[in-house]
Swiss-Prot record:
Residues 431-451 form a propeptide. Residues 1-18 form the signal peptide. Keywords: Cell wall, Cell wall biogenesis/degradation, Glycoprotein, GPI-anchor, Lipoprotein, Membrane, Secreted, Signal, Transferase, Virulence. The keyword Glycoprotein applies. Gene3D superfamilies: Glycosidases (3.20.20.80). Residues 316-336, 395-427 are annotated as: Disordered. This is 1,3-beta-glucanosyltransferase PGA4. Its main location: secreted. (1,3-beta-D-glucosyl)n 2 binds at residues 152, 198. (1,3-beta-D-glucosyl)n 1 binds at residues 81, 108-116, 151, 286. The gene is PGA4. Induction: Transcript levels are elevated during host infection, and transiently increased after induction of hyphal formation with serum. Expression is controlled by CWT1 and induced by fluconazole. Glycans are attached at residues 88, 245, 347, 394, 422. It comes from Candida albicans (strain SC5314 / ATCC MYA-2876) (Yeast).
């Protein structure tokens, strides 16, 4: 019995310690243990799409069904657009970690995000509570590669008014991660590849004196390489020029034009070549499952997965295309870029709004944020009671990184004043704690063996 328990515990510990976290240095990603440069080879993953919203990382059966196909493709990263922060994601994240797969997570849901129509009101305490609750849930996993604070919020002139609020969310997320004592997890923005806004957006989110308000990575949703295009007939060459001196990791957060199907994915050879590695760090193919937009690599029907020619072509391209050797000619940069000049196309203030006062208790690590998952309808909660009231004086103790609340099963969205500061449970997830437990079990086993 003791031996069986020991084996079970060793299996748990090995899984916890099975994958190195990814860090940012200069304009590249790096394996924190080996020191090797890390290139994103991945797919965008949201089975059901936005019309049938489900959390694929909370369903163990779905996760186990799909991870074998991730491995067959040879990918190392998935991007997930929405999760339910009331649920537990440990089993799936552990399954992915064992397969060597990282997750880039968008922290927003359809009704909990910065809106283009009223960015000021959607940036409120209840919204930030949802964001912070998602961070608490996923910061515990070493294979959480990073978080996106927004996706394609800026796509035309009127939407520029939302830019300062998205940047404020970046600041709040990074501040929350730091103050809670979590490891440094990259926070970024995923941009629509609209010619006139792609570069200024990238510069804007990576400029200014406050490094907490600057992104750590920038994703571009690009579909300019169609069929058997080239660096010049697509927009790849232009983007290489535009971002030659960009100081944080840049990658394609979506790519894979479907004007011609099956897609040949000939761009893979370019993306993972020395011609692009000085600026780009890989990308994510849109998308894993066939949805209404017809970009899928597989067809899902219940527990059944059927791969298509797109899947086979992508697999073949990944198999024959290796990453550049060494550091790939990365830019050893520090600090941000210059802010984009104002023009008739780009007219955005460099000042960003203050954090709603009701959210300060979370930023200061005094209260545990409570998520409400897909039931969070908070975009109009700027007038909610307590949204802009500093109630930090009501709290006396701080929450550490190794103390976190179990996922809430709350079914109703509470107002800003109805937060659960006392919902913290001491669930230890720090690798050092697991390591200490590991040594204790070894010592116990050794003692038993001597009897």
């Amino acid at each position: 019995m003791l031996f069986r328990s020991l084996v079970t515990y060793l299996s748990l510990v090995s899984s916890v310690l099975s994958i190195a976290s990814i860090k940012v240095e200069g304009n590249a990603f790096w394996d924190s243990e080996s020191g090797d440069r890390f290139y994103i080879r991945g797919v965008d993953y949201q089975p059901g799409g936005s019309s049938e919203l489900e959390d694929p990382l909370a369903d163990t059966n779905v996760c186990e069904r799909d991870v074998k196909y991730f491995q067959e493709l040879g990918i190392n990263t998935i991007r997930v657009y929405s999760i339910d922060n009331t649920k537990n994601h440990t089993e799936c994240m552990d399954t992915l970690a064992k397969a060597g797969i990282y997750v880039i997570l968008d922290v927003n849901t359809p009704h909990s995000s910065i809106t283009r129509s009223d960015a000021a009101c959607s940036y409120n305490t209840d919204y930030l509570q949802e964001v912070f609750a998602s961070i608490v849930e996923f910061a515990q996993f070493d294979n959480t590669l990073g978080f996106f604070a927004g996706n394609e919020v800026i796509n035309d002139g009127p939407s520029l008014e939302a830019a300062p609020y998205v940047k404020a969310v970046v600041r709040d997320m990074k501040t929350f991660i730091k103050n809670r004592g979590f490891r440094t997890i990259p926070v970024g923005y995923s941009a629509a590849s609209v010619d006139e806004y792609r570069l200024p957006s990238g510069l804007y989110f990576n400029c200014g004196d406050d490094d907490m308000a600057r992104i750590d990575m920038y994703g571009i949703n690009d579909y300019s390489w169609c069929g058997d295009a080239s660096m010049t007939t697509s927009q790849y060459s232009q983007q290489m020029k535009d971002f030659a001196n960009y100081t944080v990791p840049l990658f394609f957060s979506e790519f894979g034009c479907n004007a011609k199907r099956p897609r040949p994915f000939s761009e893979i050879e370019a993306i993972y070549s020395t011609e692009m590695s000085s600026v780009f760090s890989g990308g994510l193919v849109y998308e894993y499952s066939e949805e209404a937009s017809n970009y899928g690599l597989v067809e899902l029907k219940g527990d059944s997965v059927t791969t298509n020619d797109d899947f086979d072509n992508l697999k073949s391209q990944f198999e024959k295309t290796k990453n550049p050797s060494g550091d790939g000619g990365y830019l050893k940069s520090t600090g941000g870029n210059k802010c984009p000049p104002k023009s008739n196309i780009w007219n955005v203030t460099e000042e960003i709004p203050d954090t709603p006062k009701g959210a300060l208790k979370y930023l200061k690590g005094l209260a545990e944020p409570t998520g409400h998952g897909f039931d969070a309808y908070v975009q109009g909660n700027c007038n909610a009671k307590g949204n802009n009231v500093d109630d930090t004086g009501n709290y006396t103790s701080s929450i550490t990184a190794s103390s976190r609340a179990s996922p809430s099963q709350t079914s109703q969205v509470s107002s800003s004043s109805a937060t659960s500061a006392n919902s913290t449970s001491s669930k230890k997830n720090d690798a050092a704690v697991e390591g200490a437990g590991f040594l204790s079990v070894i010592a116990l086993a050794a003692g038993i063996a001597l009897l």
